[in-house]
Amino acid sequence: HWLARAPGEQRGAARIAARAWAAAFVALATACAIYPVVATRARWRDRFDAATGFTLDGQAYMKTARHVELGQTFALGPDLEAMRWLEQHIEGTPVIAEAHTPEYRWGARISTNTGLPTILGWSWHQTQQRASLPADLVTRRAADVDAIYRDVSVDRVLGILDRYRVDYVYVGALERIFYPSAGLEKFAGNPDRWQPVYRNAGVTIYRVVR
């Protein structure tokens, strides 16, 4: 009697198992479908100001966003205003000097958002893409950017700017956080070498006089 029932019982058990797996699959698929809807919005609220709303303007967040570097908080609005000025008033693709920072920071933000070339962008990207070149190429450039903003010698800094054919020097909140005031004051103190061409509440852009 048991042997006669065994195949039917096995089929019943198989159907139960199949239904259980199907239910599990439906639950998993439902969770996967819901996650992007719920998680994306939560992530967006965590990282961006919700007041910006939905937009195709990739720079809109800067109107209200505040950023933290080395424990200091600053608004991104002045950088956005300066970027817009550069886009509207600068012709061609002149090289602009700006702060160089470790990865995942606000460094190279002017070059990134305007398309203007800078001395050095994201260090690791440059290292990867230039593997066949001398290993210290990127570190030398990083040191030169550091010197532009730290060195108080006008002649030495002008030499570095000439080497990279830099036409504009950018001084904003990020530069004031990463570099000493003595190194930044030389730009304002030598208008015959660095002519201020733009200024707002947090940014000054200097044109290199040649």
Report residues per predicted region.
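Signature aromatic-anchored transmembrane alpha helix within multi-pass, membrane-resident enzymes
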Residues: 2-41, 47
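Extracytoplasmic
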Residues: 36-210
